Amino acid sequence: FVYWIKTGKVARLSQLENSPSRVSWSPDGKWLAFSMKVPSKELSLVSPPKKPKGANWADPPKITTRFKHESDGSGYISPGFNHLFVIPAEGGTPRQITKGDLNHRGTPQWSSDGGHLLISSNLKKDWEYDFRNTEIYKISVESGEVKTLTNRNGPDRDFAISPDGQQIAYVGFDDKMQTYQVSRLYVMDIDGSNKKEV
């Protein structure tokens, strides 16, 4: 939904199958980017027999190969992955930008030209077991092509794009597997080059 201040009206932009989160306006105000979970199929080892009329059966067993399949407070996590979408600010059909069995988490930020979305996430193959590590990624809105801007053992996060769209400030550290580690402030060019600690 969007609340238009001038008219005081609320407009429904789309009807989505899951809840969108981390909504971000494009620089020209014509598009919204957001993250949303895309369900994947439950694993099944056998097909149960047909339920007899009047039978009161227990729920079928849940089978998972996921490292993190439960969460405190919400219990079992249904299978699926978070992906990025864009939708016209006036409403319409959302278009999925990212794909695959990876979670494209983090609040998307638009590049100054509106051609890319930047996120802080972990898109590596072993992401489930490397939960302390995140990188900053630049994703083409047109093609979904992903470019990794940072690449080290440790989190790179909480980034901000400069007003001229040419640099990115972010915090992070080289993970030394200690219980407490000090985050540092860095800057780099929008293409991931010229990284330096401030």
Regions found by a protein language model. Give the residues of each.
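A flexible loop/linker signature enriched in serine peptidases of the S9 family
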Residues: F1, Q15-S21, S35-H83, T98-R105, ...
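Residue-level detection of beta-strand scaffold positions
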Residues: W110-S112, E142, G154, L185
